[in-house]
Amino acid sequence: MRLLARKKQMKQALDVAQNAIKRWPNNAEMFFLLGSLQDETGDKKAAFKTMEKLLALHPDNYQALNYVGYTLAEEDRDLDRALTLLVRANDLAPNQSYIIDSLAWAYFKAGKLDDALKEIRRAVTLDEHTDASIWEHYGDIAARAGLKDEARTAYQKAMELKPDNAEALRQRLS
């Protein structure tokens, strides 16, 4: 399946993942792979349902906790649940920058700027050189908190890491 996905043969990869789940209906890895493929192909609604099914079967799957929590936060839905899921994901997999970033983003969406700043600063110390989206979130959080220099630095780092998003970030700088 992963080979098919890498070769961008998504329809076949989705079919293989769905058949694997039929054969092994409790396999967490297969559910996560199917949800990830659905997300990658743009079927966010199906991906969310798949991750919810995964959580029903395996409530401590930190990847699914992160996916569902971040999705809820990103869509401004059920922020209390989003925070609960993301705190749990962080407890299960501490020091994972992408989970800490998701937690920071949920705090931001919930209007808890102090908590958001604390967590996003922690996320960038763990992953300062690779993930532009973490730096972009840092910029958004710092800007909302009125920390203009910090926001500028974060947006500039995001532009360095992902130059194709530079124009959108430049607009946030002004």
Residue ranges and their predicted role:
Residues 1-174:
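Alpha-solenoid helical repeat scaffolds
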